[in-house]
Regions:
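Non-heme di-metal
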Residues: 1-232
Length: 232
């Protein structure tokens, strides 16, 4: 957890001045979750391949996600705004994860985290609150590592697949990524307009997709990065 001193006044300025309370609540809900489904897929994968380090590295990632959710939750709690118990887009992602294997679940996860990187950049640019800016910066640092870790793992999973199957999964991932970007652009337009603007948002989405695609398809994808938190 980040060692913030939460100032109630600065929180109210941020949330009331740029009307982003509902947006932050949605992303806070999205950061929550134990990752039980992907953890189950990861354990099965480890049993099948002997990669015993993967489940613990993945759990370290989810521990960081829980910290993000906790910090964002404290932020909105002190502003006197209720947290969301259920949220439509988060529910859709969870539903889809339960009905895929490890590859599909990681594609959903890396899509959400890649686009979240752009959202937190917009949120950081949209506010003058040092507290919120620092929180966004910390989440961005973590999410960037998560995206690389997940993308490289997808590369390993697809390495032994026939070329047509791998190409079909890549095409499905492109559709998923584009659809998720459209949803975020519509639902979080106030934050994006204040911090980036819609054109720059979609331009950055294309950049993020190229990063993921290069890691999945590139030469360095076969050398997976251990998640930094798993070293501790």
């Amino acid at each position: 957890m980040i060692g913030f001193t939460f100032g109630f006044g600065s929180i109210l300025i941020v949330l009331s001045a740029i009307l982003i309370a509902s947006s932050i609540r949605i992303f806070q809900r999205g950061e929550e979750g134990s990752g039980r489904t992907i953890a189950r897929f990861a354990r099965r994968y480890a049993e099948r391949t002997g990669d015993a380090a993967f489940p613990s590295a993945l759990q370290a990632l989810f521990d960081e996600e829980a910290r993000h959710a906790n910090d964002l939750g404290r932020f909105i709690d002190l502003a006197g705004i209720s947290r969301l118990r259920n949220e439509f887009s988060d529910g859709v992602f969870r539903f889809m994860r339960h009905r895929t294997g490890l590859d599909g679940a990681l594609c959903l996860l890396v899509t959400a985290e890649s686009i979240a990187c752009i959202y937190y950049r917009a949120l950081r640019a949209a506010t003058s609150s040092p507290l919120l800016r620092e929180l966004c910066a910390q989440i961005l640092r973590d999410e960037t590592q998560h995206v690389r870790f997940q993308s490289q793992r997808i590369a390993l999973l697809r390495g032994s697949l026939p070329a047509p199957v791998s190409a079909a999964r890549r095409a499905a991932h492109i559709v998923l990524f584009a659809g998720a970007a459209m949803v975020v652009a519509l639902r979080h337009r106030r934050v994006l307009a204040a911090g980036l603007g819609p054109r720059r948002f979609f331009r950055l989405c294309r950049v993020e997709w190229r990063v993921v695609d290069r890691l999945v398809m590139g030469d360095d994808a076969g050398r997976p990065t251990r998640h930094p938190a798993s070293h501790a």
